[in-house]
């Protein structure tokens, strides 16, 4: 894997975590902390 590919994968993971946080209020509070 190249660094660019790893960075893209990390971005996708971060976006996925944000989406989960946005859909669950309790988890969203935990993610913001």
From Swiss-Prot:
<comment type="function">
    <text>This heterodimer may have anti-inflammatory properties, since the myrmexin complex (composed of 6 SS-LS heterodimers) inhibits carrageenin-induced edema in a dose-dependent manner (after subcutaneous injection into rats).</text>
</comment>
<comment type="subunit">
    <text>Heterodimer composed of subunit LS1 and subunit SS1 (U1-PSDTX-Pt1b), heterodimer composed of subunit LS1 and SS2 (U1-PSDTX-Pt1b), and heterodimer composed of subunit LS1 and SS3; disulfide-linked.</text>
</comment>
<protein>
    <recommendedName>
        <fullName>U1-pseudomyrmecitoxin-Pt1 subunit LS1</fullName>
    </recommendedName>
</protein>
<dbReference type="GO" id="GO:0005576">
    <property type="term" value="C:extracellular region"/>
</dbReference>
<comment type="similarity">
    <text>Belongs to the myrmexin family.</text>
</comment>
<keyword id="KW-0964">Secreted</keyword>
<keyword id="KW-1015">Disulfide bond</keyword>
